[in-house]
Swiss-Prot record:
SS bond partners: none
Protein name: Endonuclease V
Positions of Mg(2+) binding: 46, 116
Null allele phenotype: Deletion of the ywqH-ywqI-ywqJ-ywqK-nfi operon has no visible phenotype, however it is out-competed by wild-type cells.
Gene responsible for this protein: nfi
Locations listed in the record: Cytoplasm
Key word Nucleus present: no
HAMAP family named in the record: Endonuclease_5
Example of a GO MF term: magnesium ion binding
Reaction(s) the record says it catalyses: Endonucleolytic cleavage at apurinic or apyrimidinic sites to products with a 5'-phosphate
GO BP annotations listed: DNA repair
Amino acid sequence: MKVFDVHKFDMKKEQDFLQVQFNLKNRINLSPTIHPDSINTCAGVDLAYWEQDGEPYGVCCIIVIDADTKEVIEKVHSMGRISVPYVSGFLAFRELPLIIEAAKKLETEPDVFLFDGNGYLHYNHMGVATHAAFFLGKPTIGIAKTYLKIKGCDFVTPEIEVGAYTDIIIDGEVYGRALRTRRDVKPIFLSCGNYIDLDSSYQITMSLINQESRLPIPVRLADLETHVLRTFYQKNHV
């Protein structure tokens, strides 16, 4: 799959991270560029981390499924040492090198990517799902398991029914949704990544839910695969 060269990752200072985020923020597109019914393939993206000889390592897995049958079409991964330091609010800079490396291995071009992480629901609207879209050139969706509290704003818990949601509104702007994907199971936190609107993100996400998890199928599969791969690399000291 073709990946665009948007910026380098040799930055170390928070000020440099922030400048990149603000430059890209002006190019975020939350219009409906894709219709949920037109999707044939979708990908889930997740990462896992560990330490080896005092150095941080990570593995990224991308799993592509058929949107109709939910069968796995392709899976790829990348592994390596993490060179970008962790700074709160700038996690994407740490994760993107492995995401890009894995995406380049894809023979399939997914119609949409779903990330285990935030997108527009972020301090600067630049969570990993949003940031990654500039490199991937595809619509992206953020699926977070825990709530990122911004400007002290809490979310309103949705009703218990499947598909119930409440908009997450901060300073009068909708950042995302608290979404109940399974009855009586705690919600996930949905946000647009890029090149997609919130209603389409909602429809796509709900179409990928089954009884096994509150997470969309490709995200859950990617999550499981990263844990398997992390265990493998830890045991083999690769």
